Amino acid sequence: MDKVYVEGMEFYGYHGVFTEENKLGQRFKVDLTAELDLSKAGQTDDLEQTINYAELYHVCKDIVEGEPVKLVETLAERIAGTVLGKFQPVQQCTVKVIKPDPPIPGHYKSVAIEITRKKS
């Protein structure tokens, strides 16, 4: 299966289990991999035969900057479900949601979750 990557997207959202996260908000990063057949796009040089990266970006933006949720797992599920539902050629997608600055003590680069979902 071929892959389209949209990586390093950054958004500001109000997600988390702590009141401070819901009030102050924080940065979130998203990496998205969509799996689909890209052979027709490569042969025809036609955008209609692939998926538009900008549309994938806006799906992620709308969800992360939208309704607050408690868990990054919920954000990832919503992104994956929307991508699989909205883009017919996509057969599988992987979504990684990264919290660069979670409100927990310690030294670390970030915390993240990653899910992979397929069309049924």
UniProtKB/Swiss-Prot annotation:
Reaction catalysis annotation: 7,8-dihydroneopterin = 6-hydroxymethyl-7,8-dihydropterin + glycolaldehyde
A Pfam short name: FolB
A molecular function (GO) term: dihydroneopterin aldolase activity
Family from the record: Belongs to the DHNA family.
Chain segments annotated as coiled-coil in the UniProt record: none
Protein known as: Dihydroneopterin aldolase
Pathway listed: Cofactor biosynthesis; tetrahydrofolate biosynthesis; 2-amino-4-hydroxy-6-hydroxymethyl-7,8-dihydropteridine diphosphate from 7,8-dihydroneopterin triphosphate: step 3/4
EC number: 4.1.2.25
Organism: Bacillus subtilis (strain 168)
Gene that produces this protein: folB
NCBIfam families named among the record's database cross-references: folB, folB_dom
Keywords from the UniProt entry: Folate biosynthesis, Lyase
GO biological process per UniProt: folic acid biosynthetic process; tetrahydrofolate biosynthetic process
Listed InterPro entries: Dihydroneopterin_aldolase (IPR006156), FolB_dom (IPR006157), GTP-CH-I_C/QueF (IPR043133)
EC category: lyase
Listed GO CC annotations: cytoplasm
CDD domains reported for this sequence: DHNA_DHNTPE
Positions annotated as active site in the UniProt record: 99 (proton donor/acceptor)
Residues engaged in binding substrate: 21, 53, 72-73
Functional note: Catalyzes the conversion of 7,8-dihydroneopterin to 6-hydroxymethyl-7,8-dihydropterin.
